[in-house]
A protein has these predicted regions:
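Blade-edge motifs of beta-propeller repeat domains
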Residues: 36-53, 92-109, 141-159, 188-204, ...
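Hydrophobic beta-strand segments that make up the repeating blades of beta-propeller
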Residues: 71-75, 127-130, 177-180, 222-225, ...
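Short glycine/acidic-enriched loop and turn motifs that connect beta-strands
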Residues: 76-82, 133-135, 184, 229, ...
Length: 422
């Protein structure tokens, strides 16, 4: 199966959450069993009775440099199944747990996942958006003079882009971009704000990529999802060489004829041994719930991994985003997995780091991309998702605002019910 088909299937399956929600909000009709690119909101009609906003990607961080969390989500008003102009919807922090009115910045058509990092070394966090329909990565540079505002973006051609990872791939102090596109394109930053022509790392293409040192040589490697499962590309030679060994398969997706190329990957040292491990979701075979799988790096053979240990996720959750971070403040990385209607949280077992407690599931409107950040300034990290619980009608468009699951004070690692971003 081609990478294009893989990505289209993933996008189609992913849209079953936000587009189905849009149908339910827009008109007084039942929820439909099928609602994707090939079936424009079922009986909602074409175009829909009223245009609707869909939000898929999201990042959170100190974008305004005021010490508080701001939130940025993708925003697309859907008039047609494809090629709808998108925006970044920026919610600037005005204090602990307070936000200004959202500001729109034009993005590519139907933007999907976002990533953020300081790309230029100027201090403020920048944002990168992946657009499968446009076949682009769009780089938004945060103003060092007025943090939280973004000028004209840099657009990079990346056919098939569905997601992007950021990392300094050649250890030159500049952050580079790795696109989950038809070629797994590596965009090397040659000077602040300037990228070389892309290198193709894996012509078979990928639907998800992650970067991190996977063999303990101090140089980032690449993990990717293809139609079969997960492969690892280990860097070889000096950092500046940007050469990689042949891809090695480390995980095979469960057989599910309706879903291929659906693994998500995160790279982190989950057991505290100084070696990065792999955290991989799997949608599961037909009739079985999805899982998250831990592949610990083999101490005696860096760059290889032990057999996966599997943990069951909510049966109603199709995994669409993954974050590994310490959410309960015990110093051990935990796992947060977002889906169309559920967030799963797996806490690392402090008594046996690298093993995890059973997943706790939290209902959400839409968690296609999750972010971990302290939203209300209480010193506890919260879970932020692209779509909250209300959908106000604004100028004839049913809109979305991000949602947040606040961490419960006095109960580390547990979260309150979703509510709209304040």
């Amino acid at each position: 199966m081609s990478t294009k088909k893989i990505a289209e299937r993933r996008k189609s399956r992913a849209w079953s959450g936000p587009w189905l929600r849009a149908c339910a909000v827009l008109v007084t009709v039942p929820l439909f069993a099928s609602c994707d690119d090939n079936n424009w909101c079922g009986n909602c009609g074409y175009p829909p009775t009223s245009p609707s906003e869909a939000s898929y990607g999201l990042v959170a961080g100190n974008f305004t440099q005021n010490g508080h969390t701001s939130v940025i989500a993708t925003s697309t008003v859907y008039y047609y199944p494809h090629d709808n102009p998108g925006n970044l919807k920026i919610y600037p922090s005005t204090g602990a747990g307070t936000f200004g009115a959202p500001v729109l910045t034009p993005d590519g058509d139907d933007p999907l996942y976002l990533a953020s990092a300081d790309l230029t070394g100027a201090g403020p966090l920048d944002v990168v958006s992946a657009s499968f329909d446009d076949g682009t990565l769009t780089v938004f540079y945060n103003s060092a003079q007025k943090p939280g505002t973004f000028g004209a973006p840099l657009i990079l051609s990346s056919p098939g882009a569905s997601q992007v990872a950021i990392g300094d791939m050649n250890n030159d102090g500049l952050q580079d971009l790795i696109s989950a596109d038809f070629n797994v394109s590596l965009f090397v930053q040659t000077a602040p704000g300037t990228f070389a022509k892309p290198m193709s790392l894996y012509p078979g293409g990928a639907n998800w990529v992650a970067v991190g040192d996977l063999n303990n040589d101090g140089i980032p490697d690449v993990a990717l999802t293809d139609s079969v499962g997960v492969k690892v590309l280990l860097h070889t030679g000096a950092a500046a060489s940007l050469t990689y060994a042949a891809p090695v398969a480390v995980f095979t997706q469960s057989v599910n004829p309706g879903i291929t190329g659906a693994n998500l990957i995160a790279i982190a040292d989950v057991n505290g041994d100084g070696l990065n491990d792999l955290v991989i979701t799997d949608p599961g075979p037909v009739g079985s719930p999805p899982t998250v799988n831990i592949l610990l790096q083999n101490k005696s053979a860096p760059g290889t991994f032990l057999a996966p240990v599997s943990y069951t996720l909510s049966a109603t959750s199709f995994p669409q985003s993954i974050v590994v971070a310490d959410v309960n403040g015990d110093g051990h990385p935990d796992i947060v997995i977002g889906g169309s209607a559920v967030v799963n949280v797996l806490l690392n077992n402090a008594s046996a780091p690298g093993t995890f407690l059973a997943a706790a599931s939290y209902a959400t409107t839409n968690a296609t991309q999750v972010a971990i950040a302290d939203v209300n300034g209480d010193g506890l990290v919260d879970i932020v998702v692209p779509v909250g619980v209300s959908h106000p009608l604004v100028s004839g468009v049913y809109t979305n605002n991000p949602g947040v699951l606040l961490q419960v004070a006095g109960s580390p690692g547990t979260f309150a019910a979703e509510k709209d971003l304040p």
